[in-house]
């Protein structure tokens, strides 16, 4: 029973409790009205920090996915341009194959050349004009790579590079060596000794892309031998370097040779790397060496050799798979028989007669080394056999502007150039496609990560309505009971009046 009237302890305590309940009820009301569990740092300091960090990550993930979408759009534009370029290269290749057919007359080949030039110009224009948001995509601008930032952290980026596919940068790194010829009024063996360009000593090395080779013994300089080494070397195979060899030996218009009485004419043919004759033909007195006869004699003894003799426009033509062709002609007797080696190898200017009873000549095959990247070469010691003014160096690109299909040789070279160019463009297109797939996978993963991050933030920051409504109801009932009890507490001092009656 209260016996003092200046201080109502019960009312004061009830009032304090009422204010606390009011504060808690109001906060619960705000949570229900905003949907937020954390209204200020005072509500949950550590929770607010974690939620804000999660929100920051979520924002970064969202923008990163936008970046990916922008990048995919740009890459799709680039891929479309590269696809057009590939289609035009394929058409150019088709026309080069057509031009390689010798049934075409010069006018037909000229028309094919014009078509190829128009397609080449179209490729140049596509590569120069394909862009996204002002950034050129196919002219080499992106050659060194750009970064696509896909995540919420500074290190979360992907490098994307697209090589230059302009016509001036498409082609092959080509070392096109033309086999040379030489001759002497001497034996074939001495010819090789005199001009060492046509002889590869076992102490000499050939080098391609830093890979060197030496023959086990001294051999005749031979394009087929070098091509076989290049194509068979594992290191060069891994680099993608390939080689082709061919040899077409054409003589001057054939003039029948009559062997005089008392004379004998011996013709020896050397094929490939060997200094031993592969074919020996002997014509005695009274024999007439016609074009048909020498062709028949050569072919009958060429079994096992990559060699065939034939007639073209009244000339002797000897073809090999790149093997060097050497010839040694000797005459015995004092008759008036003469034989010009130019009938076998045009341009050697050697004639066997009573004055010069022996002469030799050699024709090395052509060698073509090709790759899709630059490489070094070193032919020191045999450079003269292939017409190289620089025995060593670095091979530069032979681009689409170098294509000329107005000859059979040019058309076949164009096919090699276009094959490498098409491979490069197809590789670039494949890389773009792989990058798009990679970016799409990253996008999907980051989208899931964003959803999970948002959910984690939601658990910390946002209110659980079921739980909070229970809390609000509790505080509301407390307020109602508190107000009622405060009224009762305020009435307690009035009981003192009973003592004053």
From Swiss-Prot:
Annotated compartments: Secreted; Bacterial flagellum
Keyword flag Iron-sulfur: no
Gene3D superfamilies the record matches: 3.30.70.2120, f41 fragment of flagellin, N-terminal domain
UniProt xrefs under InterPro entries: Flagellin, Flagellin_C, Flagellin_N
Gene Ontology terms for molecular function: structural molecule activity
SUPFAM superfamilies listed in its UniProt record: Phase 1 flagellin
Keywords: Bacterial flagellum, Secreted
Gene Ontology CC terms, in alphabetical order: bacterial-type flagellum; extracellular region
Pfam family, any one: Flagellin_N
Family the entry assigns: Belongs to the bacterial flagellin family.
Record-linked PANTHER family: FLAGELLIN
Function noted in UniProt: Flagellin is the subunit protein which polymerizes to form the filaments of bacterial flagella.
Full protein name: Flagellin
Species assigned in the record: Aquifex pyrophilus
Record lineage: Bacteria, Pseudomonadati, Aquificota, Aquificia, Aquificales
């Amino acid at each position: 029973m209260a016996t003092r009237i200046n201080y109502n302890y019960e009312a004061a305590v009830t009032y304090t409790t009422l204010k606390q309940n009011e504060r808690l009820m109001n906060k619960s009301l705000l949570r229900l009205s905003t949907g937020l569990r954390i209204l200020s740092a005072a509500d949950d300091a550590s929770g607010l920090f974690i939620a804000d960090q999660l929100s920051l990550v979520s924002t970064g993930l969202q923008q990163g996915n936008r970046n990916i979408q922008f990048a995919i759009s740009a890459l799709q534009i680039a891929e479309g341009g590269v696809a057009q370029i590939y289609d035009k290269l394929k058409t150019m290749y088709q026309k080069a194959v057509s031009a390689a057919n010798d049934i075409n007359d010069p006018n037909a080949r000229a028309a094919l050349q014009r078509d190829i030039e128009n397609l080449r110009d179209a490729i140049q224009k596509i590569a120069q004009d394909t862009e996204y948001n002002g950034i050129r995509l196919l002219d080499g601008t992106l050659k060194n790579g750009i970064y696509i930032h896909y995540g919420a952290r500074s290190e979360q980026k992907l490098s994307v590079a697209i090589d230059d596919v302009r016509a001036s940068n498409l082609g092959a790194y080509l070392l096109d060596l033309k086999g040379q010829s030489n001759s002497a009024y001497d034996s074939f063996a001495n010819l090789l000794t005199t001009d060492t360009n046509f002889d590869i000593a076992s102490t000499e090395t050939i080098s391609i892309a830093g890979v060197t080779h030496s023959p086990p013994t001294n051999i005749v300089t031979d394009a087929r031998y070098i091509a076989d080494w290049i194509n068979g070397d594992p290191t060069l195979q891994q680099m993608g370097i390939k080689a082709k060899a061919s040899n077409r030996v054409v003589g001057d218009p054939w003039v029948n040779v009559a062997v005089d009485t008392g004379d004998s004419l011996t013709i020896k043919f050397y094929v490939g790397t060997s200094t031993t004759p592969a074919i020996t033909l002997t014509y005695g007195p009274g024999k007439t060496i016609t074009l048909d006869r020498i062709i028949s004699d050569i072919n009958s003894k060429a079994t096992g050799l990559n060699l065939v003799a034939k007639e073209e426009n009244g000339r002797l033509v000897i073809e090999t798979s790149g093997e060097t062709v050497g010839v040694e002609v000797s005459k015995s007797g004092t008759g008036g028989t003469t034989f010009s080696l130019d009938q076998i190898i045009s341009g050697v200017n050697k004639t066997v007669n009573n004055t010069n009873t022996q002469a030799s000549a050699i024709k090395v095959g052509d060698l073509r080394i090709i790759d899709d990247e630059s490489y070094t070469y070193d032919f020191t010691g045999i450079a003269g056999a292939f017409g190289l003014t620089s025995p060593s160096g670095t091979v530069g690109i032979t681009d689409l502007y170098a294509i000329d299909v107005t000859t059979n040789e040019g058309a076949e070279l164009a096919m090699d150039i276009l094959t490498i160019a098409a491979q490069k463009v197809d590789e670039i297109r494949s890389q773009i496609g792989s990058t798009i797939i990679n970016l799409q996978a990253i996008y999907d993963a980051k989208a899931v990560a964003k959803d999970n991050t948002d959910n984690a933030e939601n658990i910390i920051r946002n209110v659980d309505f079921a739980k909070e409504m229970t809390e609000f109801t509790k505080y509301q009932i407390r307020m109602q009971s508190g107000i009622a009890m405060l009224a009762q507490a305020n009435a307690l001092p009035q009981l003192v009046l009973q003592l004053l009656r």
